[in-house]
Amino acid sequence: MFKKIDHVEIVTDQLERTVDFYTDVLGFKLKARDRSDRSSLGVPLQLVYLELGGTSVELMAYEGGSVAPAPADEHLGYRMMALEDRR
């Protein structure tokens, strides 16, 4: 049985604008900020952790990077499931 969405990770090149949208428009609460000097891509990474109703959103911004918009005629979707046995 499905119980909840635990967390979602979103990569953005407009971190503060994205934080404002999630907090001011959607009502998420800011939980923490973090920064890693060297990410797996070899550049610094900024992280923002938000929460609403038991669901966390992790915003990630790679310093010096940009996120290109998808072409208008293209749809991109990801599906992933992680199961945890809590017996």
Regions found by a protein language model. Give the residues of each.
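Core segments of cupin and vicinal oxygen chelate
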Residues: 9-55
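Generic beta-structure capping elements
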Residues: 53, 60-64
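Helix-adjacent hinge/juxtasegments
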Residues: 59-60, 71-74, 79
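N-terminal beta-strand motif that seeds the catalytic metal site of vicinal oxygen chelate
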Residues: 1-16, 78-83
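A cross-kingdom feature marking solvent-exposed beta-strand/loop segments within repeated
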Residues: 67-68
